[in-house]
Design a protein with these regions (language model features):
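Acidic, Mg2+-coordinating catalytic module of metal-dependent nucleases/exonucleases
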Residues: 85-91, 97-101, 130-163
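Active-site-proximal helix-loop-helix substrate-binding element of RNase H-like nuclease domains
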Residues: 39-42, 47-53, 60, 115-153
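Residues that form generic nucleotide/phosphate-binding pockets
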Residues: 52-55, 66, 80, 101, ...
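Substrate-recognition/cap helix-loop segment adjacent to the acidic, metal-dependent catalytic center
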Residues: 93-113
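Short non-domain terminal segments
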Residues: 109, 117-120, 163
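Conserved non-catalytic scaffold segment of RNase H-like nuclease domains
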Residues: 2-3, 7-95
Length: 163
């Protein structure tokens, strides 16, 4: 059994950090958590205004007011995702943001996050392009982590069930 994780972030640079994480589980359960950038001892100050306007639509103020503490987010992810033999994400950026999140919490994940194209290549011989094409044609990504994780799961389900 496998789970899907998706992140939204403050931007797309080496200075960016996770602002929302969501997951989708085999039973159809999905969840997302906003992350409070003030709850880390790391210097999470980078903010890409264009990413806010064009991608995730979240303000830093919303994150500061409604976001969870990084330690609480990591503990929740470890509890929920630690029971799955495989946890997939759809980009290497997600791997980067997972590392940044756990570093900020001074914790380690209880699961291994694998980029989906590597898994699909090994499982079905499918290239990243197949996944991207299916993702673009079968669903609309809203850049809301929980919703997007669920959409990614639907696409992967379709690809692995295809002859």
């Amino acid at each position: 059994m496998w789970a899907i994780v998706d992140f939204e972030a403050s931007g797309l640079s080496e200075h960016s950090y996770p602002i929302e994480v969501g997951y989708s589980l085999p039973d159809g359960t999905s969840n997302s958590m906003l992350i409070n950038p003030l709850s880390t001892s790391d210097n999470w100050t980078h903010w890409d205004q264009q990413a806010q306007l064009d991608i995730h639509k979240l303000t830093r103020q919303t994150l500061e007011q409604e976001g969870m503490q990084v330690v609480d987010v990591c503990q929740h992810l470890n509890t929920v995702l630690g029971q799955y033999e495989l946890v997939l994400c759809d980009s290497e950026w997600d791997l980067f943001w997972l590392g940044r999140l756990y570093h900020a919490a001074h914790m380690r994940p209880s699961f291994v996050l694998t980029e989906v194209s590597h898994w699909l290549k090994n499982k079905n011989g499918l290239e990243r392009g197949h996944f991207k094409l299916a993702l673009d044609s079968l669903c609309e990504m809203k850049h809301q982590a929980g919703y997007d994780a669920k959409q990614i799961r639907l696409v992967i389900d379709t690809l692995v069930k295809s002859p």
